[in-house]
Amino acid sequence: INGLFNTALPTNLKIIILNNSSGGIFEMIEGPDLLGDALKYQTTPHSYTAENLAQHFKLGYYKGDTLGSFAKGMDKLIQSKTASILEIFTSQESNIEFYGSFKKL
């Protein structure tokens, strides 16, 4: 978030957020799975979105919750003439699928 305080954000700045409402990144990368029960202390269930963040910093904001809306959101994000955020809402289970799709871009 600190980087958004820059008063001269480039118009080609595009941010993609995978929001699974918990911090499930630790289930997608190697290492934390070796911690066993400690993994539950590395997640923080929440109901926050990035929409207010985008409004505060005057960024474009797009959202979606399916692979189809992800593709449409990517098109909007790429075509946007301003610094923008694309927020994809996923479940913990589908988070890995979205992440895999994103890595193929």
Q: Predicted regions span which residues?
A:
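Thiamine diphosphate
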Residues: 1-105
